[in-house]
């Protein structure tokens, strides 16, 4: 890193509690030439989401906790954006730049924060629209000499010129030449920062990112959005710099460093779908600096293939509808048309051919980023697990479950009423999930949150996003799988399995391996009272069906006396693809 980079540092704001630049905590990063900082229109607190791009202020008012996380940020939003995008000159034993900022920019930014926040709080704008408005107000370039920021930039360059001309007299001739070179480089970098085209690009790129984030949130189903946020929870740049403790105290914005020229060119050439996918990949953890023309072409080709597959699927459905209409019309006319075997075979082969073609043309990609191997492989590539008695117990009748829990030492379940056991059976009697867990596709659905130690044993935790439908209730949440290693075989034993109802706002905390509610079992009973999962069967009279789709895994429990009646349905969502 050279001296120029050392002096030009952007301060990313975390714990902004007032409208001044005096912050309790901050983090610094280098902004190099040809790069811009884009800010995502999400407010985070720790790993959790506090405000979505689509959130209006009226939505926040209904949730006091979200208001508490976001209000300090609103009142200081302009200073935060300034710190992300421009920053300032730091020079030891000389506060001239700090004084210049206080005189020329402090009030300007304070007014913008106040005015834009009032409009957002009283109006009908979304948070992404609010962020766009802040950028436009700060970096407006339509006035004389390019606006207030450009004029301030000219003043900064004058001060730098003064530093170049007035080198400290005690310096030697060689040190004076170094002083001149240093401040000459700083002047060039300042000219770049306050270039009118760069400021226009700042506004344009931020609008592009805000629009894409809003479309992502509106276009995804709730469980898909939760999967996106779950996948990206550990891949936050600012949070990583500050650590969990600091990032958990106040609301903060996340950022990416990108080449604005490349992003703008991609948007003009390929349109909004490719831009949206690029932004989604950054939310999943793709580094903005890694997005080059080659990567953009790869994403564009993937989007084209996705659209072709969608068109083929629509065409296939239309053909089926037309065939169904013809059959219905034939029955109505009283003409019984028998479909000969060759026609049926032709229809089947057509479907198989389309599906095979789709499979062959799927671009190579990873599911959810780098995949960790979970479980011990058995023959045929399937993973081997054992089931602890505290998990297999839930397959029994509520009466039997209560009887067994009352005999156990685990305080959490002992003494529960029969009604409570019946309610909890819906969330815990999901052993059909283990079929997916031991399959080769497990990593496409489950996120390995990492290992941790509790009660003297090493434990692991797998989490998948899902939707549980029981009766008239439809619940969004996660499927949790807690494991420990069997000794001496090393085979994972599933000691915890349940569906946990979870909202989007809490998904970050729930994804943590040390999530308190999931791991409140201090000591695991390792008395060998568990069975090999390959031998697991549901008791007689229980009917359930597994439905495998490209983007989901579904377990359907039916009434054994009436197969048309669905008692419960659990759908596990596939992890988003990292390109």
From Swiss-Prot:
Signal peptide: none annotated. This is UPF0329 protein ECU06_1620. Belongs to the UPF0329 family. Residues 345-360 have a biased composition (Acidic residues). Residues 329-338 have a biased composition (Basic residues). Residues 325-360, 370-389 are annotated as: Disordered. Pfam families: DUF1609, DUF3654.
């Amino acid at each position: 890193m050279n001296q120029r980079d050392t002096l030009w540092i952007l301060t990313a704001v975390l714990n902004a509690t007032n409208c001044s630049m005096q912050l309790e905590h901050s983090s610094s990063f280098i902004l190099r030439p040809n790069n811009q900082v884009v800010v995502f229109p999400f407010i985070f607190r720790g790993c959790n989401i506090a405000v979505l791009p689509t959130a209006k202020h009226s939505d926040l008012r209904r949730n006091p906790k979200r208001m508490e996380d976001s209000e300090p940020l609103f009142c200081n939003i302009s200073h935060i954006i300034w710190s992300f995008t421009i920053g300032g000159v730091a020079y030891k034993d000389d506060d001239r730049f700090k004084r210049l900022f206080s005189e020329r920019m402090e009030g300007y930014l304070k007014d913008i924060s106040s005015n834009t926040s009032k409009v957002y709080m009283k109006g009908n704008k979304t948070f992404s629209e609010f962020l766009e408005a802040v950028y436009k107000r700060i970096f407006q370039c339509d006035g004389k000499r390019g606006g207030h920021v450009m004029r301030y930039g000219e003043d900064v360059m004058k001060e730098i010129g003064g530093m170049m001309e007035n080198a400290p007299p005690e310096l030697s001739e060689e040190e004076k030449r170094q002083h001149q070179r240093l401040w000459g480089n700083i002047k060039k970098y300042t000219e770049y920062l306050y270039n009118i085209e760069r400021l226009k690009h700042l506004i344009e790129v931020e609008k592009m990112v805000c629009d894409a984030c809003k479309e992502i949130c509106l276009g995804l189903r709730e469980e898909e959005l939760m999967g996106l946020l779950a996948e990206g929870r550990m891949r936050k740049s600012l949070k990583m710099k500050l650590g969990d403790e600091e990032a958990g105290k106040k609301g903060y914005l996340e950022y990416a460093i990108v080449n604005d020229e490349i992003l703008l060119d991609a948007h003009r050439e390929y349109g909004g779908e490719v831009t949206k996918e690029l932004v989604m990949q950054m939310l999943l953890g793709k580094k903005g600096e890694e997005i080059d023309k080659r990567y953009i072409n790869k994403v564009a080709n993937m989007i084209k293939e996705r659209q072709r597959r969608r068109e083929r699927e629509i065409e296939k459905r239309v053909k089926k509808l037309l065939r169904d209409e013809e059959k219905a019309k034939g029955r109505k006319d009283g003409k019984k048309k028998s479909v000969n075997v060759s026609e049926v075979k032709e229809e089947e082969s057509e479907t198989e051919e389309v599906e095979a073609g789709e499979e062959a043309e799927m671009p190579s990609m990873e599911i959810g980023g780098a995949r960790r191997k979970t479980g011990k492989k058995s023959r045929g590539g399937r993973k081997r697990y054992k089931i602890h008695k505290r998990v297999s117990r839930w397959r029994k009748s509520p009466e039997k479950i209560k009887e067994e829990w009352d005999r156990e030492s685990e305080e959490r379940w002992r003494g529960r009423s029969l009604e409570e056991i019946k309610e909890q059976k819906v969330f815990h009697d999901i052993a059909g999930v283990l079929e997916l867990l031991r399959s080769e596709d497990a990593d496409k659905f489950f996120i390995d949150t990492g290992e941790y130690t509790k009660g003297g044993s090493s434990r692991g935790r797998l989490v998948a996003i899902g939707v549980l439908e029981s009766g008239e209730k439809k619940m969004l949440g996660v499927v949790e799988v807690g494991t420990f290693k069997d000794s001496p075989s090393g085979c994972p034993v599933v000691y915890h399995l349940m569906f946990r109802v979870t909202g989007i706002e809490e998904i970050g905390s729930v994804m943590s391996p040390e999530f308190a509610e999931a791991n409140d079992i201090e000591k695991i009973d390792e008395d060998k009272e568990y069975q090999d999962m390959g031998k697991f069967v549901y008791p007689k009279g229980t009917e359930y069906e597994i439905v495998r789709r490209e983007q989901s895994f579904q377990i359907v429990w039916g009434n054994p006396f009436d197969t048309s009646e669905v008692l419960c349905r659990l759908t596990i969502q596939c992890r988003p693809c990292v390109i």
